From Swiss-Prot:
Keywords: Acetylation, Cytoplasm, Methyltransferase, S-adenosyl-L-methionine, Transferase. The lineage of its organism: Eukaryota, Metazoa, Chordata, Craniata, Vertebrata. InterPro entries: SAM-dependent_MTases_sf, Thiopurine_S-MeTrfase, TPMT. One of its GO terms (biological process) is methylation. The modification N6-acetyllysine is found at K58. Its EC number is 2.1.1.67. It comes from the Eukaryota. This is Thiopurine S-methyltransferase. It comes from Lynx rufus. One of its GO terms (cellular component) is cytoplasm. The gene is TPMT. Monomer. Belongs to the class I-like SAM-binding methyltransferase superfamily. TPMT family.
Length: 245
């Protein structure tokens, strides 16, 4: 890793009240999918995941990999193609169906009996299962434990007031020896209310520090023209590797 990649100077702001009280409903997230407002989706996959894939997988085979708030992340097929078992959770049924369609994967669907109105979509190959439900309802279903968690666009999308509950669920899903890759964003939260929400280093330490070793792998300037409409003039993505203490 290029040492300069972790030396980008990022100003840390205390978590602001405007974001602490911010709430997006599940229906608002569904509407984003219906309206095509999914700027968070990366058609070519996540570059930092590609770069640090060996660190994440650590040469192990047939891993169980969890994708919280998965959307139609193309990386799910990457892992499945490598022989890993992928499980995701997503509130938008449209997003899940688009994943299978765009990846040319046949699938089946069935109701989740423990969660009224929820469904699980499974690839015909059997190694991709996507749960269409509220992530916070997921503990009602026994989906097993995971060796790896890829958290990109998840912690930053969860309402700030729900972060502790979210983290508790994530850590409850980990197996011994897990590796948890977490991508968060830094920008001036006084200028943009989110989502994606600003997650400072102190918050990550507060959420994960008691149970995880926390290592920042890389910081990257990801500012694009579209971010100007947010009222900000910089945005930095930070990638953390969380491992068992």
């Amino acid at each position: 890793m290029d040492d300069t990649s972790t030396l980008i100077d990022v100003k840390e702001y205390p978590d602001t009240e405007v974001q602490k009280n911010r709430v997006l409903t599940l229906e608002e997230w569904r509407e984003k999918w219906v309206d095509g407002k999914i700027g968070f989706h990366q058609e070519q996959g996540h570059q930092l995941l590609k770069k640090h894939l060996d660190t994440f997988l650590k040469g192990e085979n047939v891993l169980r990999v969890f994708f919280p708030l998965c959307g139609k992340a193309v990386e799910m097929k990457w892992f499945a193609d490598r022989g890993h078992c992928v499980v995701g959770v997503e509130i938008s049924e449209l997003g899940i169906r688009e994943f299978f369609t765009e990846q040319n994967l046949s699938y089946s669907e069935e109701p989740i009996m423990e969660i009224p109105g929820a469904k699980v979509f499974k690839s015909s190959s059997g190694n991709i299962s996507l749960y269409c439900c509220n992530l916070f309802d997921l503990p009602r279903v026994n989906i097993g434990k995971f060796d790896r968690i890829w958290d990109r666009g998840a912690l930053v999308a969860v309402n700030p007031g729900d972060r502790k509950c979210y983290t508790d669920i994530m850590l409850s899903l980990t197996r011994k020896g897990f590796r948890y890759l977490l991508a968060v964003l830094s920008y001036d939260p006084t200028k943009h209310p989110g989502p994606p929400f600003y997650v400072p280093d102190a918050e990550i330490k507060n959420l994960f520090g008691s149970t995880c070793n926390i290592h920042c792998l890389e910081k990257v300037d990801v500012f694009e023209e579209r971010h100007k409409s947010w009222g900000i003039d910089y945005i930095v993505e930070k990638l953390y590797l969380l491992t068992e203490k």
